[in-house]
From Swiss-Prot:
Organism of derivation: Metamycoplasma arthritidis (strain 158L3-1)
GO biological process: translation
Name of the protein in question: Large ribosomal subunit protein bL31
Example of a GO MF term: rRNA binding
PANTHER family reported in the protein's UniProt record: 50S RIBOSOMAL PROTEIN L31, CHLOROPLASTIC, LARGE RIBOSOMAL SUBUNIT PROTEIN BL31C
Keyword line: Ribonucleoprotein, Ribosomal protein, RNA-binding, rRNA-binding
Gene, per the UniProt record: rpmE
SUPFAM superfamilies linked to this entry: L28p-like
Assigned GO CC terms: ribonucleoprotein complex; ribosome
Protein's job: Binds the 23S rRNA.
């Protein structure tokens, strides 16, 4: 085998941008930034909030009210 052709594998701290928790991974990359981790992801936390869906329903109801009052 040839020596020194493989990248250096080291432990890297990966920081979640949502909750700020740090995880330690093995990687060849210097810095890892996570959008969502197991600490704050809805699947792992059991949180079943439907913020997006709720907002869309409210928007639909506002449009419906406008159409009723203008008609």
């Amino acid at each position: 085998m040839k020596k020194e052709i493989h990248p250096n594998f080291k432990e890297v701290k990966a920081t979640c941008t949502s909750c700020g928790k740090e995880h330690i991974f093995g990687s060849t990359v210097e810095k890892i930034s996570l959008d969502v981790c197991s600490n704050c992801h809805a699947f792992y936390t059991g949180d079943r909030s439907t913020v997006k869906a709720r907002g869309r329903v409210e928007r639909f109801n506002k449009i419906l009210e406008k159409s009723k009052t203008s008609a």
